[in-house]
């Protein structure tokens, strides 16, 4: 029995979603396959989408070292965080330590620049 592919596609095109669902179930039973297995190759393409979704949106400003001029680093920490003198001094002396967490990239870069200008070593994580 010759079967025309175009006629088959036309028949599929005219089916409702419910009829298509029944067809998929019948194919699964007839050929012993699973529609979920068919989705696995598409999951590989989803891996690329997941990599894009993993792009970092929140950054933590980590003070690694206060540098030679600890006073300037303390002033910069106070400006960035709004901490008092004692709290800022304790934070600088406890390096490596997070100065600020959950910042946007622009805010994190600005804080990093301010700390580096004060002579501190800083990392964004």
Curated annotation (Swiss-Prot):
InterPro entries: Ribosomal_bL12, Ribosomal_bL12_C, Ribosomal_bL12_C/ClpS-like, Ribosomal_bL12_oligo, Ribosomal_bL12_oligo_N_sf. It comes from the Bacteria. GO terms for molecular function: mRNA binding; structural constituent of ribosome. One of its GO terms (cellular component) is cytosolic large ribosomal subunit. Forms part of the ribosomal stalk which helps the ribosome interact with GTP-bound translation factors. Is thus essential for accurate translation. Homodimer. Part of the ribosomal stalk of the 50S ribosomal subunit. Forms a multimeric L10(L12)X complex, where L10 forms an elongated spine to which 2 to 4 L12 dimers bind in a sequential fashion. Binds GTP-bound translation factors. Belongs to the bacterial ribosomal protein bL12 family. This is Large ribosomal subunit protein bL12.
């Amino acid at each position: 029995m010759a079967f025309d592919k175009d006629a088959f596609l036309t028949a599929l095109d005219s089916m409702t979603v419910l009829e298509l669902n029944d067809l998929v179930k019948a194919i699964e039973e007839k050929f012993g396959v699973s529609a979920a297995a068919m989705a696995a190759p598409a999951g590989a393409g989803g891996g690329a989408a997941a990599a894009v979704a993993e792009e970092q949106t929140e950054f933590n400003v980590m003070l690694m070292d206060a540098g030679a001029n600890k006073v300037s680093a303390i002033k910069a920490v106070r400006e960035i965080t709004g901490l008092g003198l004692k709290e800022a001094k304790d934070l600088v002396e406890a390096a490596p330590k997070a100065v600020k967490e959950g910042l946007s990239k622009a805010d994190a870069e600005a804080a990093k620049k301010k700390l580096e200008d004060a002579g501190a070593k800083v990392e964004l994580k």
